[in-house]
Structures are given as C-alpha cells and as structure tokens.
Amino acid sequence: MSAEGYQYRALYDYKKEREEDIDLHLGDILTVNKGSLVALGFSDGQEARPEEIGWLNGYNETTGERGDFPGTYVEYIGRKKISPPTPKPRPPRPLPVAPGSSKTEADVEQQALTLPDLAEQFAPPDIAPPLLIKLVEAIEKKGLECSTLYRTQSSSNLAELRQLLDCDTPSVDLEMIDVHVLADAFKRYLLDLPNPVIPAAVYSEMISLAPEVQSSEEYIQLLKKLIRSPSIPHQYWLTLQYLLKHFFKLSQTSSKNLLNARVLSEIFSPMLFRFSAASSDNTENLIKVIEILISTEWNERQPAPALPPKPPKPTTVANNGMNNNMSLQDAEWYWGDISREEVNEKLRDTADGTFLVRDASTKMHGDYTLTLRKGGNNKLIKIFHRDGKYGFSDPLTFSSVVELINHYRNESLAQYNPKLDVKLLYPVSKYQQDQVVKEDNIEAVGKKLHEYNTQFQEKSREYDRLYEEYTRTSQEIQMKRTAIEAFNETIKIFEEQCQTQERYSKEYIEKFKREGNEKEIQRIMHNYDKLKSRISEIIDSRRRLEEDLKKQAAEYREIDKRMNSIKPDLIQLRKTRDQYLMWLTQKGVRQKKLNEWLGNENTEDQYSLVEDDEDLPHHDEKTWNVGSSNRNKAENLLRGKRDGTFLVRESSKQGCYACSVVVDGEVKHCVINKTATGYGFAEPYNLYSSLKELVLHYQHTSLVQHNDSLNVTLAYPVYAQQRR
C-alpha cells in the first residue's frame, strides 16, 4: 500500500545542528509524507513553497537518513507515491563484448583507454572527480591567458596521456607538465569516459528546446531544470556544473586567450554530447546549447539563505560544571585590559578552539573582545552590550558575558558565522599559566638558560642551512623551468622550419631530378638531415633537463618538509630561552653573568652586553629622557649632532615611548613598546624592566637587528656634553 508524498531537491549544503536534523548535499532528493504537513495545518498548494513551511520532516533518498531539514534550502519537484524502499539503481557501466565476437587491436586499445564511470569516480560532498579537479586547477593556474590553449595539440601521444590519467591522483605533480599536455589530457579525460557528461537520455529534449534558444531567462531556467533532472545521475550533474564553471572562467579572459563562449562550445560540445550519438543535423543546435550555458553565471552557487526560525530546544540544567552566575572577574578565560600583542603571544601555536576574552580596545563600557583560534589563525569577535544584554550580533539575548561564553562552549559558533564551525573548547586560564622556569635558584636557572640557548643556536644553524639550500634550489628550479620553456619554443621553431623545408624540398628535388643535378639533391638532403639532427639534440637536452628538474623538485619538497619539521622546535626553544632570560633579568642578575651563560662574552648579538660602566652618562636619565617632547623638537635638538646621539621621549601612541637617534647624519625615530613583559623595540625583545635598562643595553648593541636602516648604537645621550 502506498501513501501520497512530495519530492524536494537540495539547493545548498546543510550540516545538521541538532540530533533530529539530517545533512543535505547539493542535489539530494528528499521525500516528505503529505500527512505530516496536513497534521501541521498546511493546506494543499503550500507544499510547493517549502520556504514558507519552515522546517520539514522527511527522508533523504540520496543518503538514506530521516529527519528535519530547512525548507529554505530545497526546491519543490512534485508529488510522489511513497512505497517501501527499493534497491538503488546501479550507475551506468559499459556493456561487455558479446561471447564469440573477435576484438581488433583498436578495440583492445579503446577498452584500455576507458575510465571508470563518473558515478564510480567520486561521490558528494565532493564537487567533481579528483583527477579532473587537479587538471582544471593546473590549467587555470598556468594557462588562463594562453592564446593557444585547447587549440594547439601537444607532442604527447595517446599512451603518454593515458599514463598521466592512470597515475595515482595525489602523487601527480602537474606543475612540471606543459600546459598544452595538460589541455590534451583534459580532452582525453572527457573522451575516455564510458558515457558522455551529458547522457544520451536527455539529447532529444535538449534538441527540441534548442531551436527556441533566444538567450532568454525563461529558456535558461528550462534548460537548468532539464539538466538537473533526476534521470541524470547526480555525479553527472556535478561534473557538468564544474566544467561550466571552468569554461565560464576561461571566457572571462577571452581578450587574452581568445576562448569566448562560442569557441569553447565548438571545441567541447562534441566531447560533452558525443555527436556520434546524435544527428549531425543537430550539431549547431547542441553547440548553441553549450554556448548559452557557458555565457550565463547560473553555475555560480549563491550563498545559502538564512535558516528559518526553529523552536528553541528544551533547556536542561547544565551538568558540566559551568556556572552562569559566576562573575566575569572570576572567569579563568577573562584577562581584562591586555593588549592584542599579548593575546597573540598567549594563543601562539595553540589548537583550534583555544580562546580568551579581554576588554574591547574601543574602551566602550561593557564591550569585550573574544579571541578564538581557528584554522591556525586568531579570529577577533566583538561582544556587544546594550540594555543589559550581550551577544555577537542583534538580537542580543544573553544576560552576561559568562552565559554567552558557556553557551558557545557547548554549541558551535557556526550559528553566528558559518565559517566559524568550532566550539570554545580550550580556555587560556589566567590561573593556570605554565610555569616554564621550574628551578628555584639563580645558578640552576642560568645553567638551563645556557642549555636552551645552545640547543636554539644549533637548531637555528640547521634551519639557516636548510633555508639557504631551499632558496638556491628554488632559484635553480625556476631557471630550469624557464630553460624548458625556451627549449619548447626552439623545438617549435625548428619543427616549423623542418616542415617548410620538407614541403619545398620535394618540389626542388623533383626539379633537380629532371635536370639530373644530383649534387643539389644531395645538398638539400644534407641540410634536411642536419636540421632533423639538431631537433633531436635539442629534444634530448630538454629530456635530460626535465629529468634533472624532476629530481630537484623532489629534493625541494624534502627540504621544505624538513624545514617545517624544525620550525615548531625552533619557536618553542626560542620562547623557552627568552622566558628563562626574562626570569633572570627580573631577579636583577647582572648583564656580565647573563653573557657568560649565553656564551657570547666576546661577541655582539641580541643579548651581548659589555662590562657595566658606572661612569657612563646613560645612568643619569636626565641626559636622554626629554619627557613629552614631540618629533619636531627632537629633530631640532639632534640636528648637527654626531651619529649615535639620541634621546627618549613620550610617544604620540598612548602608553609608549619613542627613541630619536642620529644615523648617517639624519634623525631617525623608532617606537619603544611597553608591555606586560617589559620595554623593548619588538617582540620577543620586550624584556627590559625600565627605560634605563633598555638604554644601557643598546649603548653597545646595534639597533640594526630591529631595522636595517638603524645600524647604530645609543652611544651619546643628547644632554651628556652639557652636563659634564
């Protein structure tokens, strides 16, 4: 016994948010029982407007799931009798050769060149076959503006193209392959499919529509409905959509590649339709169909519409230990008024879902900023406050920041922004900061500093060596690629000369034979052989260069892999070393002792310090600290002074200072940061507990490590001479 129901097709992907929901993928077919809509009070005719119904409960025939889905994400197809489930139809496949029939060599070759059916190559949510995607991406990257793309045949034979298509997709390195070879492989792919991308089942309907083509919106809508018919396997529809996106992108740069919609349709309509299956009388109509499809942007998916309102889930008492009544000041993840730089430092190299909250930089009362780690980057989200309510956007519905954060520790932020599909998983706690320095006496900490610094220096040298090798290899690879392109152009020129000479040589040889001039015949043949020999030499040279390039590209990838494996260790070692150094500095350890542990008593680097000189004028802050002076006054004070003369003043940037120093006869300015870890010119060197300590350090250490144009030390305080 069957019941009446309705069919819908998914227009957008939807990822379920509740247990009772089901996932949707573009093109999924869904069935809804008529009785379920009647029970909700909907009348006949409303089933055709699912966006007005809101959430529907039905069965996804594509995935076999049953549950709720949003009506704004689907379109109505029609009525359907609902019966017990039947086995899914098998995807189309080539027929076997009848027993007893003989195969010619051509048949064997053709069978060997047949790819799996599209339905066997991929499945949603993938948008197209992996190999096709890789070919298209490589072609668009290298040949989007190539004036001979898809119109010039490469020198590769059928076997070579088939070998390329047979390769394991992830292992294929298409960067080294000429764009014309890629284009031929792309065409070969379409021809080697057992069935055309547009199956023969819809030829007749397309042909009947074709004479009516007037580029009208009505025709395009009819064509869309036809191509997206359930009679076409879903993978065919997705593949066609992907190809049309590619063709549309090419047509957008037709001023350079000369591939407008008409030219593309002439090239590819035989491959998409396989004209052998259709009457030659209809060729022009089918070309026109593809031209219309390429010329429109209907294949560009629009953003999914807003979800319809859904009844709120019944609230249950939280049993995860979260307390919405906790004060914000007591929350471990609330850090108060800290800078963005400090936040970046705390979230550096952390996992996705790590978060903290700070006061908003706008300083508006009640506004805060949530910083969340997602995709290896920090995402800043403003928390708004109005009329006693909090939230990321209107309407503001949470009674407190604590309630807001606790909500999104259980629910994905995709509710707020679809791109933020992550929960607030790992709070950065202000109560449980890692205590890196475990030792309890200065000498033990100093030994550890020496140990970590040694490891850091070794890793740095290894990384620098790999980086030099990486840069050199990259340059050599680029040179070889350029040389291969030059070889290709040279071979092309020589082959054209060879064809020209061959064409004219026949005429002259016939002429000289009639005249009996054997000497001229031999000269022509000798020149022709010489030209052919030269072409062979160039082709051999190109082949050897391509082999070298392939080996070097493998080495290049290996170097890159090793650099990436070292980088996290290097970052962690630097961070640990700097924390040990900062601990010792805060304990008042003299610079000479730090120098010994760092092993650079006789060298100058970022931590190198000379013996403290109690007689230096730098100890008197009045010789260089000029207070609230501005840039113009600073330049007037320093004009005509020798290199290294400097002063420190308050910066126009609130809470910071500026250093003005004479370099090569000119006055330069640089900001001195004031952070929670201390003063400094840049991270991670904001380590100095006072401006005086910073000035004493850079009295003998060049500023060049922070700025290439500042190769100078803070040698002479601006007022030092007057005070002596």
From Swiss-Prot:
<dbReference type="Pfam" id="PF00017">
    <property type="entry name" value="SH2"/>
</dbReference>
<dbReference type="GO" id="GO:0042267">
    <property type="term" value="P:natural killer cell mediated cytotoxicity"/>
</dbReference>
<dbReference type="GO" id="GO:0005168">
    <property type="term" value="F:neurotrophin TRKA receptor binding"/>
</dbReference>
<keyword id="KW-0242">Dwarfism</keyword>
<feature type="modified residue" description="Phosphoserine">
    <location>
        <position position="154"/>
    </location>
</feature>
<feature type="modified residue" description="Phosphotyrosine">
    <location>
        <position position="467"/>
    </location>
</feature>
<comment type="similarity">
    <text>Belongs to the PI3K p85 subunit family.</text>
</comment>
<dbReference type="GO" id="GO:0005634">
    <property type="term" value="C:nucleus"/>
</dbReference>
<dbReference type="GO" id="GO:0001953">
    <property type="term" value="P:negative regulation of cell-matrix adhesion"/>
</dbReference>
<feature type="modified residue" description="Phosphoserine">
    <location>
        <position position="279"/>
    </location>
</feature>
<dbReference type="GO" id="GO:0005159">
    <property type="term" value="F:insulin-like growth factor receptor binding"/>
</dbReference>
<feature type="site" description="Arginine finger; crucial for GTP hydrolysis by stabilizing the transition state">
    <location>
        <position position="151"/>
    </location>
</feature>
<dbReference type="InterPro" id="IPR035020">
    <property type="entry name" value="PI3kinase_P85_cSH2"/>
</dbReference>
<dbReference type="GO" id="GO:0046326">
    <property type="term" value="P:positive regulation of D-glucose import"/>
</dbReference>
<keyword id="KW-0343">GTPase activation</keyword>
<dbReference type="GO" id="GO:0030183">
    <property type="term" value="P:B cell differentiation"/>
</dbReference>
<feature type="modified residue" description="Phosphotyrosine">
    <location>
        <position position="580"/>
    </location>
</feature>
<dbReference type="GO" id="GO:0002687">
    <property type="term" value="P:positive regulation of leukocyte migration"/>
</dbReference>
<feature type="modified residue" description="N-acetylserine">
    <location>
        <position position="2"/>
    </location>
</feature>
<dbReference type="GO" id="GO:0045944">
    <property type="term" value="P:positive regulation of transcription by RNA polymerase II"/>
</dbReference>
<feature type="domain" description="SH2 1">
    <location>
        <begin position="333"/>
        <end position="428"/>
    </location>
</feature>
<keyword id="KW-0813">Transport</keyword>
<dbReference type="GO" id="GO:0035655">
    <property type="term" value="P:interleukin-18-mediated signaling pathway"/>
</dbReference>
<dbReference type="GO" id="GO:0005158">
    <property type="term" value="F:insulin receptor binding"/>
</dbReference>
<dbReference type="GO" id="GO:0052742">
    <property type="term" value="F:phosphatidylinositol kinase activity"/>
</dbReference>
<dbReference type="GO" id="GO:0046982">
    <property type="term" value="F:protein heterodimerization activity"/>
</dbReference>
<dbReference type="GO" id="GO:0032760">
    <property type="term" value="P:positive regulation of tumor necrosis factor production"/>
</dbReference>
<feature type="compositionally biased region" description="Pro residues">
    <location>
        <begin position="84"/>
        <end position="97"/>
    </location>
</feature>
<dbReference type="GO" id="GO:0005829">
    <property type="term" value="C:cytosol"/>
</dbReference>
<feature type="modified residue" description="Phosphoserine">
    <location>
        <position position="608"/>
    </location>
</feature>
<dbReference type="GO" id="GO:0120183">
    <property type="term" value="P:positive regulation of focal adhesion disassembly"/>
</dbReference>
<dbReference type="GO" id="GO:1900103">
    <property type="term" value="P:positive regulation of endoplasmic reticulum unfolded protein response"/>
</dbReference>
<dbReference type="GO" id="GO:0005943">
    <property type="term" value="C:phosphatidylinositol 3-kinase complex, class IA"/>
</dbReference>
<keyword id="KW-0832">Ubl conjugation</keyword>
<dbReference type="GO" id="GO:0034976">
    <property type="term" value="P:response to endoplasmic reticulum stress"/>
</dbReference>
<dbReference type="GO" id="GO:0005068">
    <property type="term" value="F:transmembrane receptor protein tyrosine kinase adaptor activity"/>
</dbReference>
<dbReference type="InterPro" id="IPR000980">
    <property type="entry name" value="SH2"/>
</dbReference>
<dbReference type="GO" id="GO:0019903">
    <property type="term" value="F:protein phosphatase binding"/>
</dbReference>
<dbReference type="GO" id="GO:0008630">
    <property type="term" value="P:intrinsic apoptotic signaling pathway in response to DNA damage"/>
</dbReference>
<dbReference type="GO" id="GO:0019209">
    <property type="term" value="F:kinase activator activity"/>
</dbReference>
<feature type="domain" description="Rho-GAP">
    <location>
        <begin position="113"/>
        <end position="301"/>
    </location>
</feature>
<dbReference type="GO" id="GO:0032869">
    <property type="term" value="P:cellular response to insulin stimulus"/>
</dbReference>
